[in-house]
Amino acid sequence: MRQLRILIFFISFLGLATLNAQQKTDTIKTKESYGLRIGVDFSKPLISFLEEGTKGLELVGDVRVLNNYYAAVELGYEDKISKEDYMNYTTKGSYIKAGVNYNAYKNWVGMTNEIYVGMRYGFSIFNQTLNSYTPNVKGTYFIPTEVLPNTEFKDLSAHWGELVFGMKAETLKNLYLGFSFSFKKMISTKEPENFKNLYVPGFNQVYLNDTGFGMNYTLSYLIPIVKKEK
C-alpha cells in the first residue's frame, strides 16, 4: 500500500507539470537541454535506518544521447543480514548496472519528464557469510539444534539482465523525482559448494527460476551541458 501511494504521488507530479506546460506558447524551433543527470536512490538510506542489519547506497546517472534515448548507469553496495527458515547469513558486496532507456512520453515545450522502458546488464562481486543454520530434522527422536559455523565464502560473482519501467518528473528547475520497477533474470553466478546464492547485491532476493524484482525511488539533478534544437 505504501509503494502504491508513492507511485500515485509521482504520477500526480507528472500530471501537474504537464498542465503548467500547456499554458506556454509553442514556437517553430525550440532548444532542449542535453547533459549529465546524477542522483541517489533515497530509499536505500531510509531502509538502512528502519531495518536492522541492512546497509546500502545506490548512485544513479544518465546522459541524453538522442532525442528520446538515454544511456543509464546505477552503482552501489549492500551489506545485508538475511534470515531464512533454517539459516542466517550475511551478504556484502558491490554492483554496477548499465544500459539504455527509451522515453515514450511526449513532452510539451520546455518539459523534460519521462515515462520510459529500458534494459540493463548487471554485475556484482560479493562475499557470503553463513552465520548459523538449523538442520531440517523432523521427528520425535531428534531435536533440531542451531549450528554456528561463521563460514565466509569470498570472491563470488553474478551476471544478470533487467527489463525496467519507470518515470521521472521535474519538480524544480533541473531537479527530478523518479521511480522505477525492474524484472531481473540471472544469467550466471559463481556459488560456493553446497550453498546457493539466495541474495545478490543489486539483484536482491533470488527467486525460483533465478528471477528477481526491484524498485527504486530517486532524487537527481541535471547538469546541462549543451542545448540542441528539437
Positions of PLM-derived features:
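Outer-membrane beta-barrel "beta-signal"
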Residues: K97, N101, N209-K230
